[in-house]
């Protein structure tokens, strides 16, 4: 009797792709987040309300939301459109855009589960060689699917009933 199913596959971080819209005030122009970045993960920062009733020995917890953010340290590469967009916002307040998360390990026929979120970008440090920034996800994401052709994603929101 096998304890591990035979169809288990190891996911790679390159299969969880993130794109930033570098033209947020017009038609989306998605650029990959990844050039010059060796490590990045989305922190969910869950909000949990805890309450312990006097008649119980253990507390109750209510997961009320997430405060997602992506903290990035990126080596600077001239002509990388995503870096150029981040760099242009170094001294700007409320520098907003959109972020697209695509799970390419879960797709069928070139269509992948995806989430699009509004976001706020803040630069925390810049040395010329590296730039550090945080992308704060705003509100609930729009669920949908994405296809990727020539490195450019096309997002299609899921229609709700």
Map each language-model feature to its residues.
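Extended hydrophobic/Leu-rich segments
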Residues: 8, 19-22, 102, 155, ...
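Solvent-exposed edge beta-strands and adjacent loop segments
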Residues: 2-73, 118-129
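Surface-exposed, hydrophilic segments of mature proteins
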Residues: 23-29, 108-114, 147
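Intrinsically disordered, low-complexity acidic/polar segments
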Residues: 81-83, 142-145
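Short, low-complexity, polar/charged sequence segments that are solvent-exposed and flexible
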Residues: 89-95, 118-122, 152-157
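Short beta-strand and beta-hairpin "edge-sheet" elements
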Residues: 100-143
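Structured, beta-strand-rich domain cores
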Residues: 59-113
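Intrinsically disordered, low-complexity terminal/linker regions enriched in Pro/Ser/Gly
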Residues: 145-161
């Amino acid at each position: 009797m096998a304890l591990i199913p035979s169809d288990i596959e190891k996911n790679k971080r390159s299969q969880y792709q993130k794109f930033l819209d570098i033209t947020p005030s017009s038609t989306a122009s998605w650029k990959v987040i990844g050039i010059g970045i060796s490590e990045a993960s989305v922190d969910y920062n869950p909000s949990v309300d805890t309450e312990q009733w006097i008649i119980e020995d253990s507390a109750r917890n209510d997961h009320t939301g997430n405060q997602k953010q992506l903290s990035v340290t990126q080596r600077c590469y001239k002509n990388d459109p995503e870096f150029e967009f981040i760099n242009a916002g170094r001294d700007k307040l409320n520098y907003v855009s959109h972020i697209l998360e695509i799970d390419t390990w879960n797709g069928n026929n070139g269509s992948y589960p995806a989430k699009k979120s509004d976001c706020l970008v803040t630069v925390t440090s810049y040395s010329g060689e590296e730039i550090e920034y945080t992308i704060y996800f705003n509100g609930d994401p729009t669920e949908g699917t994405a296809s990727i052709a020539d490195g450019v994603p096309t997002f299609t929101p899921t229609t709700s009933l």
